[in-house]
UniProtKB/Swiss-Prot annotation:
Part of the 50S ribosomal subunit. InterPro entries: Ribosomal_uL4, Ribosomal_uL4-like, Ribosomal_uL4_dom_sf. It is found in: Plastid, Chloroplast. GO terms for cellular component: chloroplast; ribonucleoprotein complex; ribosome. Probably binds the 23S rRNA. One of its GO terms (molecular function) is structural constituent of ribosome. Residues 43-80 are annotated as: Disordered. GO terms for biological process: translation. Belongs to the universal ribosomal protein uL4 family. Residues 64-75 have a biased composition (Basic residues). HAMAP family: Ribosomal_uL4_B. It comes from Porphyra purpurea. Keywords: Chloroplast, Plastid, Ribonucleoprotein, Ribosomal protein, RNA-binding, rRNA-binding. This is Large ribosomal subunit protein uL4c.
Amino acid sequence: MTVKTQLNYQVYNWEGQVSGNADLNLKISKDSGMYLVHRALVKQSNEKRQGSANTKTRSEVRGGGRKPWRQKGTGRARAGSIRSPLWRGGGVIFGPKPRSFAKKMNKKESQLALRTALNNKSVNTLVVENFDTYFQKPKTKLFIEAITRWNLDLNKKLLVIVDKKDLNVYLSIRNLYNVEIISADTLNIMALLAAHKVIITVDALSKIQEVYNG
């Protein structure tokens, strides 16, 4: 079941002062929200797994075609192959094989989970005016000063969501250990949940409204 909700934000300028207001209208999941968000997180986590772990069974290990010794009369336990899983250098029983860990999730479900997570993060979200014009060249110090003016803590994980990646902004931010920058159309559940605070530009907020509110 989905319900419509409107999130109201104060918009801060580059100097850290309130310059206006912005709204974000979302259709979010009411009853099963946490379940959907969890499924989306598991799906994205699984997609990062290579699934390439591989072991050889006794039939795949090279050699071992000849019986080591005759069946009876030696006093030793019977053996049919030196590649038995009981032997050193033998095959592996029930070992891992290459496989896909991917989980299916419908596009509407995925977007609903993302909107629900955005709603849950609204308390820790800061909307700011577009600031790409302030970066005529890459300069990390400029962004650190802005973070201070916005009363944010660089010791905690920050997610910066912009309309589109500006090269100078990206190069200025990427050197900061606790700050991740992504464009609105590549917003994902893992980045959103991992962040302690979320910074969204005004244009990115409009893009989120347009792209994910289907």
